[in-house]
């Protein structure tokens, strides 16, 4: 049985004070919902602080991105080696904001995916369609292509030690949430697509749903057969709200 995972992506938010308050406010939720893994992905500058604050807790953490290179003249980047040294378990790769704002292709995402397990991190592969692609009925083709880039680069079994985050781009931070039935349809398709290549991988890999996940809808979303938790944005910045989302995964 796949363990539930609820991961907060703080994006470009937080201060030293808010990080301390937020982590301290999540300690009980992580302890009380023992069947759920609770993780946070802070901005890189706050990772050392999160490392210290989570030392004696059940909270895990990761980065929002990592570079394809492990060292060198790459100003502004953070390598998987560096992130691992500061205790990160995870790193997001291919978040839609990286794909759209920074122009990261599926091939670049596949390169980032490949370098993370080589250096001890678990990649959280983010995939999903835009509103235009959704309305054109292209969702399944889009997520298949995004997955195929990784499979071509690293092989299907690389997903044994990875997490998939499905985020319909049109639902991220917009307040527009897919119904539980629609939210379940694409993770189910992802698992079916994987099963055609390796049934064991398909059964093992955790698939998270992201896109305006909040306390009011978390239990119903996480209750779907092929959704193993959530990749949570805005609600993860409030300890009370995020704790309720976490509880939804253990309901």
Curated annotation (Swiss-Prot):
Record keywords: Cytoplasm, Gluconeogenesis, Glycolysis, Isomerase
Isomerase is among the record's keywords: yes
PANTHER family: TRIOSEPHOSPHATE ISOMERASE
Residues annotated as catalytic: 95 (electrophile), 167 (proton acceptor)
Subunit structure: Homodimer.
Function: Involved in the gluconeogenesis. Catalyzes stereospecifically the conversion of dihydroxyacetone phosphate (DHAP) to D-glyceraldehyde-3-phosphate (G3P).
Enzyme Commission identifier(s): 5.3.1.1
Family note: Belongs to the triosephosphate isomerase family.
Gene that encodes it: tpiA
InterPro entries: Aldolase_TIM, TIM_sf, TrioseP_Isoase_bac/euk, Triosephosphate_isomerase, Triosephosphate_isomerase_AS
GO biological process: gluconeogenesis; glyceraldehyde-3-phosphate biosynthetic process; glycerol catabolic process; glycolytic process
Matching SUPFAM superfamilies: Triosephosphate isomerase (TIM)
Residues reported in the UniProt entry to bind substrate: 9-11, 173, 212, 233-234
Superkingdom: Bacteria
Pfam families: TIM
Disulfide bonds: none
Record protein name field: Triosephosphate isomerase
GO cellular component: cytosol
UniProt-annotated location(s): Cytoplasm
Catalysed transformations (reactions): D-glyceraldehyde 3-phosphate = dihydroxyacetone phosphate
Pathway named in the protein's UniProt entry: Carbohydrate biosynthesis; gluconeogenesis; Carbohydrate degradation; glycolysis; D-glyceraldehyde 3-phosphate from glycerone phosphate: step 1/1
Principal location class: cytoplasm
MF term (GO), any: triose-phosphate isomerase activity
């Amino acid at each position: 049985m796949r363990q539930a995972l609820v991961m907060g992506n703080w994006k470009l938010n937080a201060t030293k004070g808010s990080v301390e308050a937020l982590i301290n406010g999540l300690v009980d939720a992580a302890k009380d919902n023992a069947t759920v893994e609770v993780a946070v992905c802070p901005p890189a500058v706050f990772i050392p602080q999160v490392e210290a604050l989570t030392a004696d807790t059940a909270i895990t953490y990761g980065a929002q991105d990592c570079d394809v290179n492990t060292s060198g003249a790459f100003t502004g980047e953070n390598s998987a080696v560096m992130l691992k040294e500061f205790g990160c378990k995870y790193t997001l790769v291919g978040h839609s904001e990286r794909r759209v704002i920074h122009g990261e292709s599926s091939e670049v995402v596949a390169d980032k995916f490949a370098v993370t397990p080589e250096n001890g991190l678990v990649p959280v592969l983010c995939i999903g369609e835009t509103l235009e692609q959704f309305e054109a009925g292209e969702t399944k083709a889009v997520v298949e292509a995004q997955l195929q880039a990784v499979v071509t680069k690293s092989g299907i079994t690389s997903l044994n030690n990875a997490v998939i985050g499905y985020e319909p781009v049109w639902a991220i931070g917009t307040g527009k949430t897919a119904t539980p039935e629609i939210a379940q349809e694409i993770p189910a398709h992802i698992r079916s697509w994987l099963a055609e290549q390796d049934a064991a991988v398909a059964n093992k890999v955790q698939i998270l749903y992201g896109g305006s996940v909040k306390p009011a809808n978390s239990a119903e979303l996480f209750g779907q057969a092929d959704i193993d938790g959530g990749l949570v944005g805005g609600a993860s910045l409030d300890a009370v709200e995020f704790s309720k989302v976490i509880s939804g995964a253990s309901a």
